[in-house]
Each structure stands twice: as C-alpha cells, then as structure tokens.
Amino acid sequence: IADLSQARTCNAYRIDGYAAGEGPLPPPGTVDEPQSQAVTSDKPQDIYGYPVVSSAVPIDDLSRANLSKVLSDPGTYLWDVAKGCEFLPGVALRFTGSNVNVDILICFSCDELEIYRNGERVGHEDFDPRRSDLLGVVKKLFPEDEAIQALN
C-alpha cells in the first residue's frame, strides 16, 4: 500500500454496503474491469459480497499519491478503538499489481476501512483522524454521486 504508483491499475467503485448478499446485481457490463483480473467473491458483479453500483473510475496520479500518503501514515488510524457500528462500505478501491492485488473497502458511516490482499482480509481499522483527506479524494473521484457529495 505504501507505494500505489507501483500498481498496474487503480480503480474506484461505488458499492452498496446495505445490500451485501441480497438484492439484484447491476446489469452485466456495468463494471468495465475484466473479471479475470479482479479479486471478487463468487458473484461476478460484487466485491466481497457488496454489489457494485458504478463503473470503474480510474484513480488519477494525484489522488493515488494522496491515498498513499494517508494510508501509509500510522497517524491515520485509531489503533485501540472499538466501535459498535455495522461496517457498511460505500466505496471500494482496487489496486492491481503484477504479484499482488489490494482492495480497500471504505465505510464513511463509521470511518472504518477493510483491507484485502490477494483476496484475504488482512486488516480493519478506524481512520477518523484522516476522514477529511479520504473523503476529499473520494468526492473528487465521484463528482456526480449525490450520496458521496452529501457527506461531510
């Protein structure tokens, strides 16, 4: 995660945390990333059980640099905090390298993220101290998304 510039592809997706494992999936072809290159669950149009509700949005170099800075900073995380909220991610970030794939699911309701490496969950942490930084990047990536733009 420390150097996202090494990733071959970097895409962001809107996902529906409230509909995990239920409801209809988006129509075929709405995710424009080949599934053979994606780390997904057994459903072709979801990421770890969360339905994908947008096309892939390429993450630009500036956003990638900002994400690298925020995600690699130990001060981003509240290491000794436990929250009682339900993790309902609305955004997934997917970084694909030659030997490693990293997915980061972000929940702005509880300011938590989950990290998956090559399909295995390797972390879950609170990011309250850097919420505004992550939200700024996500708002830039999804300028037409009313739900994302309404977050503050």
Q: Where in this protein do the model-derived segments appear?
A:
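Function-determining sites in protein domains
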Residues: 1-152
